[in-house]
A protein has these predicted regions:
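A structural signal for short loop-to-beta-strand junctions that line the ligand-binding cleft
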Residues: 1-14, 174-181
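Short helix-loop capping/hinge motifs at secondary-structure junctions, enriched
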Residues: 13-25, 47, 115, 194-202
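Short, solvent-exposed loop/beta-turn-alpha elements that line the ligand-binding surface or hinge
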Residues: 16, 26-30, 61-64, 79-104, ...
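Extracytoplasmic/periplasmic substrate-recognition and gating elements
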Residues: 154-209
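Extracytoplasmic/periplasmic solute-binding protein
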Residues: 1, 5, 35-91, 137
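Glycine-centered hinge/linker elements that transmit conformational signals in sensory
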Residues: 38-45, 81, 85-122
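Short helix-initiation/N-cap motifs at beta->coil->alpha
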Residues: 31-36, 119-134
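Paired acidic/hydrophobic, glycine-rich loop segments that form the ligand-binding mouth/hinge
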Residues: 138-142
Length: 209
């Protein structure tokens, strides 16, 4: 199964922001790179009371076992760009040349959250999705499976038509043309130590699936 993920946003809250005097953008179409995203997010955070939110981003869940959005999904972005620059698809030595870009978006999440940075270690993904569903936050990083989480929250205030996606911008040159992240994290593997007959049967089974 191929997954897609990015920054989920509540369009109702965004439209409310765009209508404010002095808004840093007039529509989501203008938010097509990190610089503009940062400008808008920081302005929204400053005007959170007017928008009726507790913070722009839902909690960056850092409870042990709940950090997969950052150590896998978000980390895929700098790794992708490093691989792209080197023309490779695998490596034994990751240089993390786009670490500053990773830090850009991670800091934006943490510093413009509905939860104080020092408390993020106590937050789970469920907490994060509940904050978004209850209208406490305007944005949350998650994937195309997110609606079931949002809709499953008791008291959900977000309409299905207001759940929309924005690419995860990090400040990489040319990111205006970047789309949502897509990929798969799980693979079937065949043991090379198995007999040739068993390997062939396994391949046939996977192809049948």
């Amino acid at each position: 199964v191929v997954e897609g993920y990015g920054i989920i946003y509540n369009d109702a809250i965004m439209q409310k922001y765009f209508a404010l005097d002095g808004a840093k953008a007039a529509s989501m179409d203008e938010i097509n790179n990190f610089a503009k995203l940062k400008e808008v997010v920081e302005d929204m955070q400053a005007k959170k009371d007017e928008l009726g939110i507790e913070g722009v981003f839902a909690s960056t869940s850092l409870t042990p076992g709940e950090d997969w959005r950052w150590q896998t999904h978000l980390a895929n972005i700098p790794v992708y760009y490093e691989f792209k620059d080197k023309g490779i698809t695998d490596t034994d030595n990751l240089e993390f040349t786009y670490s500053d870009n990773f830090k850009n978006i991670f800091d934006l999440y943490i510093n413009n959250s509905c939860t104080a940075p020092g408390l993020l270690g106590s937050k789970s993904v469920d907490d994060s999705m509940a904050e978004f569903a209850l209208g406490q936050a305007a944005m949350v990083q998650n994937g195309n499976w997110g609606w079931s989480q949002i809709n499953g929250v008791d008291g959900n205030t977000v309409k299905a038509e207001d759940v929309k996606f924005l690419p995860i911008y990090t400040g990489v040159e040319g990111e205006e043309n970047q789309g949502l992240c897509t990929g798969t994290e799980n693979f079937f593997c065949i043991n090379k130590e198995a007999s040739a007959e068993d390997q062939a049967a396994s391949i046939a089974f996977v192809e049948w699936l």
